[in-house]
Design a protein with these regions (language model features):
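Alpha-helix/helix-capping structural signal
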Residues: 10-11, 41, 79, 121
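Acidic active-site catalytic centers that drive phospho-/nucleotidyl reactions
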Residues: 8, 45, 100, 119
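A general alpha-helix detector
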Residues: 11, 45-46, 83
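Acidic, PIN/NYN-like endoribonuclease modules and their adjacent C-terminal/linker elements
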Residues: 2-4, 104, 108-138
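Active-site neighborhoods of divalent-metal-dependent phosphate/nucleic-acid chemistry enzymes
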Residues: 72-118
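Short glycine/serine- and small hydrophobic-enriched flexible loop segments
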Residues: 48-51, 108
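Short, well-structured N-terminal submotif of metal-dependent ribonuclease cores
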Residues: 1-38, 51-64, 129-130
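Nucleotide phosphate-binding site architecture
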Residues: 13, 44, 124
């Protein structure tokens, strides 16, 4: 695994919510020692999911993880938004949403080959600009 790991919402939520069916594998993934990078839209989506499921503890745990430095939020730059929209339009049949596209755009900008996600349906189809395909974990 690379020393930096771009993380999608599904893995963060799975790791933070002990009741999630993928909690063990997600926890192992985020505890493996890589620097965890969260694109900023992931933070907002995580809060929305936590609130919709009535598990606000996940939001609190996320914020505490940001405050203690165990996770780093990366803001999107203009070129990331441009790339994300390009991906949303190209993969409209999936459909690929802006949050997932932003995860891909950040991984491309940081030249990362691995993404932590449970969303195989979207991330296994998209072809990144810098490599043939992403390695998906867990």
């Amino acid at each position: 695994m690379s020393t930096t790991l771009v993380v999608d919402t599904s893995v963060v939520f799975g790791a933070l919510d002990a009741g999630d069916p993928d909690h063990a594998s997600c926890s192992e993934t985020v505890s493996a020692g890589a620097a965890l990078v969260l694109p900023a839209p992931v933070v907002v989506e995580l809060d929305w999911i936590a609130r919709s499921r009535g598990t606000l503890d996940a939001t609190s745990a996320l914020v505490n993880g940001l405050l203690d430095g165990s996770m780093l939020v990366v803001n999107l730059e203009l070129e990331d938004y441009a790339r994300a929209i390009e991906l949303v339009e190209k993969y409209a049949d999936l459909p690929l949403d802006l949050v997932d596209a932003s995860v891909i755009a950040i991984a491309e900008r940081l030249e990362q080959d691995t993404i932590a996600t449970l969303d195989r349906r979207h991330f296994s189809v998209v072809r990144p600009s810098h490599i043939d395909a992403f390695t998906l974990v867990p």
